[in-house]
């Protein structure tokens, strides 16, 4: 994985979107994009190459949109170090739709992109279990499905499969429940964050990696795991699931 220091220009460019969204939003963006290996992995592996219409389920304050737009800007710059030399070109988004159940996160996202009318992004407040999904070439679900019960998890995945065209892509991050101590640590951290943000207990419905892959196959996808630990102690896995 690319050293975090090499990503400083990209992280700064993405975090700059949040200068109008408040100090917390901008600081959170900078820390999250610097230390969470999922964002770098998406670009380093080129998993969204050629995907122009993106649907982000459980988008939070829109970090993925900021990351991808900043990536395109950095890639087109001539300045040395603006883009990691070994990375493939980033995707060029024609449209991005993020759906988020937390109204405060949606408000931050909308404020962040309000000064960039050229960015083809929209943020919808609602529940991914209920809202209609717009047309997309790729759907991204990062650290979201384990907040839903098992029946809802499958229902969302089947709806995603129906919404995607042939050769469509689903990109998911999950925690491998068979990962031993790393999983226990990650789950404890997740529960703490949820309690701090939501002020209530939320049950987590996790699965082992093999069970996630089996479920995806049952829902019409062919999935493979991508390396993503990035030096962290957790057992998170990025799943690249193509329409079978």
Regions flagged by a language model, labelled:
Residues 2-45, 61-132, 151, 171-244:
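Class I (Rossmann-like) S-adenosyl-L-methionine-dependent methyltransferase catalytic domain
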Residues 136-137:
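Local beta-strand N-terminus motif with an aromatic residue
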Residues 47-49, 165:
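Short conserved AdoMet
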Residues 52-60:
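Conserved class I S-adenosyl-L-methionine
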Residues 140:
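A conserved beta-strand element that flanks and buttresses the S-adenosyl-L-methionine
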Residues 154-166:
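A short glycine-rich, Lys/Arg-flanked "PGG" loop and its adjoining helix->strand segment in the class I
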Residues 143-144:
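Short catalytic micro-motifs in class I SAM-dependent methyltransferases
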């Amino acid at each position: 994985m690319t050293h975090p220091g090499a990503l400083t220009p990209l992280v700064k460019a993405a975090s700059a979107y949040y200068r109008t969204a408040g100090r917390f939003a901008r600081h959170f963006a900078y820390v999250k994009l610097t230390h969470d290996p999922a964002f770098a992995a998406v670009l380093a592996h080129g998993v969204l190459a050629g995907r122009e219409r993106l649907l982000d389920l459980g988008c939070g304050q829109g970090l993925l949109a900021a990351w991808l737009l900043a990536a395109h800007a950095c890639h087109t710059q001539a300045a040395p170090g603006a883009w990691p030399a070994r990375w493939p070109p980033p995707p060029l988004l024609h449209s991005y739709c993020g759906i988020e159940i937390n109204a405060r996160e949606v408000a931050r996202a909308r404020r962040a992109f309000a000064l960039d009318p050229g960015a083809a992004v929209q943020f919808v407040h609602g529940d991914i279990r209920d809202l209609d999904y717009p047309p997309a070439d790729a759907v991204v679900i990062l650290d979201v499905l384990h907040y839903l019960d098992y029946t809802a998890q499958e229902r969302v995945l089947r709806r995603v499969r129906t919404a995607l065209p042939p050769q469509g892509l689903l990109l998911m991050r999950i925690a491998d429940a068979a990962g031993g101590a790393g999983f226990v640590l990650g789950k404890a951290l997740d529960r703490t964050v949820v309690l701090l943000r939501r002020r209530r207990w939320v049950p987590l419905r996790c699965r082992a990696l093999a069970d996630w892959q089996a479920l995806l196959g049952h829902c019409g996808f062919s999935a493979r795991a991508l390396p993503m630990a990035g030096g962290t102690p957790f057992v998170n896995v990025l799943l690249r699931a193509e329409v079978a």
